[in-house]
Amino acid sequence: VILSVRSASSTFGDNIMRHLLAILIATVWISIHEFVRNQLVLADHWADHYTAMGLAFPSAPVNGAVWGIWALVLVIAIHFLARRGGLLETAAIAWIMGFVLMWLVIGNMGVLPLCILPVAVPWSMVEVIGAVYIVQKFRSRVPSRQA
């Protein structure tokens, strides 16, 4: 009986660690892509667009921290969606929730430079598919909850 309790406890702890590691790695994956895409590849487009509006592009450390929180929340949503969906289904829902809705809002506010979308759309799709893959790979030993 003691052995089975330890075994169950160890399995539970292993599962929790697997989930947390999946979330951490996928969050880092998304954060790296966001930084490279927006702060390196498309930085001039963002800066020019904001300058044309008479604004400075928000690039203070606190802005980066908020984007880190956004990435974490997106990955947590992916984690729960992945329990019931396959790779492409989960990625499609997560991409719409995380990116399409964001672009609609910031586009409506006039702060989205539309010229970035030909690069941002496919890149963000790869980004989300990669995050879903990471989450599913690390969760592969954890049974999914089918309805």
What are these regions (language model features)?
Residues V5, F12-A147:
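Juxtamembrane/disordered regions of integral membrane proteins
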